Amino acid sequence: VPQSYIVRTMRPADVEAVLRVQAAVYPASLLESAALFQNRIEIAPATCQVALDGQDLIGYLIAYPWDAGLPPALDRSLERLPGAADTWFVHDCAVLPAAQGGGVAAALL
C-alpha cells in the first residue's frame, strides 16, 4: 500500500502505464485498447484521472456524463458525450493489487 500518492488528470502519455494497470487487474476478456483510453481523454479530459506513487502509475479512473440508457459498448470509441446526460458513468476504476486498501480508489472517485 503506497504511503503517499497524488491524483492528477490523465494525459495521453499515461496510457501505456494505464494499460499495464488494467492488465494486472482485469481478465483478458475485459481489456480495452489504448485507442479507447485516448478517446476518453479526448472527450472527457477533466474526469479521466490517474494516481501516482512517485513516478509509478498505481491506479486510474475513467468517468463521464452519460444518459441512463445502456452503457457504452466495451472498447468502443465515442464521437461525443450525450447532450442530455443524467447519469455520472464510472467506466472504469482500477488500482494495482499492491496498492489496494490504501484509499487510492476513493481518492480517484
Where does each model-flagged region fall?
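Glycine-rich phosphate/pyrophosphate-binding loop shared by adenosine-nucleotide-utilizing enzymes
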Residues: 5, 56-60, 88
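A short beta-loop-alpha structural element at the N-terminal edge
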Residues: 5-18
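Helix-loop element at the rim of GNAT/NAT acetyltransferase active sites that forms part
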Residues: 9, 20-35
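Hydrophobic adenine-recognition pocket in adenosine-nucleotide-binding enzymes
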Residues: 10, 93-95
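Short loop/turn motifs at secondary-structure junctions and domain boundaries
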Residues: 39-44
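Conserved beta-hairpin
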Residues: 47-61
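Conserved acyl-donor/pantetheine-binding loop and adjacent beta-alpha core of acyl/acetyltransferases
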Residues: 61-93, 100
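Conserved acetyl-CoA-binding loop-helix of GNAT-fold acetyltransferases
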Residues: 95, 101-109
